[in-house]
Structure formats: structure tokens, C-alpha cells
Amino acid sequence: MSTPDNVSSVCEHWVVPAYNIQLWLGRQHPCCVIIPVINEGERIKNMLNKMHALNISGAADIIIVDGWTTDGSLGVSALQQLSVRGLLLKTSAGKLSAQLRCAYAFALEQGYEGIVTIDG
């Protein structure tokens, strides 16, 4: 398993697309669930409601990486009520793989030991 120092030295050589941190409440668990989204509308709200009902946030931190959603489905206060701990906004070119590279680099920099990815 990589230590944070090892991760930092490896990350220096990665080409990570630019992103902004819209919401970050800190790491609570050793694992996280990463959800890449773009204009998911009610679908992401329904999925987050189901995850909240199942208390997924009791076992892993939920981090959403947004590829420039314009449908208003990712209000920060609503996400916080559904136990989302992080919202990243990809600001450079690229599609899904760029979103995932942003999120994985962020998760490793935060010291997560396990990452689960689900489709938004």
C-alpha cells in the first residue's frame, strides 16, 4: 500500500486535468465512492437519495466529479444534505476519462486507501 509520501511523488509525474474544488468537507473514511456526472438531472438525485437511505456515507466518503453540469442538479447545499463530502469541477478539456483522472488524483492526494467508482 502506498504511503502519502509515495503517492505525492508519483502524482508529480501525472498529467491531471485542471479542476476546482467546489465542496470539500474532509476525509472521514479510508475509502471513497467517486461518481462522475454531467447533466444527470433527477437520475443523480435519485441515486444519492438511495445511497443516503443505505447509509453508504457511513462506510465511504462520496465524491462527485462534475464535467460542467448545466441542468442545476448539483446544488451544494442539497449535496451536503445527502452526505456528499466532495464536489470537484473539471475545468479543462476532456470527457469522462479526464473527470476520472481529476477525481483519482484528488482521492489519492487525500490519502484514500480504496476507491470505488460508480456511473452517475
Predicted feature locations:
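Short, ordered loop/turn segments at secondary-structure junctions
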Residues: 67-68, 91-93, 120
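Short beta-strand/turn micro-motifs composed of small residues
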Residues: 35-37, 66, 118
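Short loop->beta transition adjacent to catalytic acidic/histidine clusters or analogous donor-positioning motifs
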Residues: 29-32, 52-63, 85-86
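A conserved acidic beta->alpha catalytic loop
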Residues: 66-75
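Short beta-strand-to-loop acidic/aromatic patch adjacent to the donor-nucleotide binding site
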Residues: 112-120
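Conserved donor nucleotide-binding strand/loop of the catalytic core
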Residues: 74-110
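Residue-level preference for short helical/loop micro-motifs built around acidic side chains
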Residues: 42-46, 71, 98
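N-proximal low-complexity "stem/linker" segments adjacent to membrane-targeting elements
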Residues: 1-50
